[in-house]
């Protein structure tokens, strides 16, 4: 039977990610694996940035971006940076599962936060960290089904290792 030494878990910090993480910890405990928790902050596509900056002007666009970031930080975390807030949320995932380094049969865990294209960053981090498995959580579809978005499709297409997509938690 194949064993997974390093599992890359991708999270968007949603309830679906939290549910998927419970399965990741079960696998990690079964295999004695290390878990890498990855959160990618999606970038605004360059072409869209260009169009908006031309519409409003470069200075106004930068001002809008700065204002948006400040408001988002204030709304979500007060004075805590967005990266710190994400680290706290990911640590909360670990705490809920009773996961700490070298505890409970898990070889360890690491939290990585990156900015960029989500699928590309997941594939890059999988290779850089020599991951044997990628685990992603699907989201709930519009009509109570499971939605597999473009990021999951791109990772499935480009992955060099197995990818597990965990459906959303059953309702009820």
Task: Please give the residue ranges for each predicted region.
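Structural beta-alpha unit
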Residues: 1-3, 78-134, 171-172
């Amino acid at each position: 039977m194949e064993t997974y030494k390093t599992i890359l878990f991708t999270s968007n910090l949603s309830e679906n990610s939290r549910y998927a993480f419970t399965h990741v910890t079960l696998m990690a405990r079964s295999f004695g694996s290390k878990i890498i928790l990855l959160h990618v902050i999606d970038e605004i596509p360059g072409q869209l940035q260009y169009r908006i900056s031309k519409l409003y002007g470069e200075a106004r666009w930068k001002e809008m971006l700065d204002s948006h970031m400040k408001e988002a930080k204030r709304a979500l975390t007060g004075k805590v940076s967005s990266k710190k807030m994400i680290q706290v949320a990911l640590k909360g995932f670990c705490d809920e599962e009773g996961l700490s380094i070298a505890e409970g049969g898990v070889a360890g865990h690491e939290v990585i936060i990156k900015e960029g294209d989500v699928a590309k960053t997941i594939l890059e981090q999988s290779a850089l960290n020599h991951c044997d498995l990628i685990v992603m959580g699907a989201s709930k579809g519009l009509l109570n089904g499971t939605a597999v978005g473009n990021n999951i499709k791109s990772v499935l297409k480009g992955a060099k290792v197995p990818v597990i997509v965990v459906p959303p938690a059953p309702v009820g």
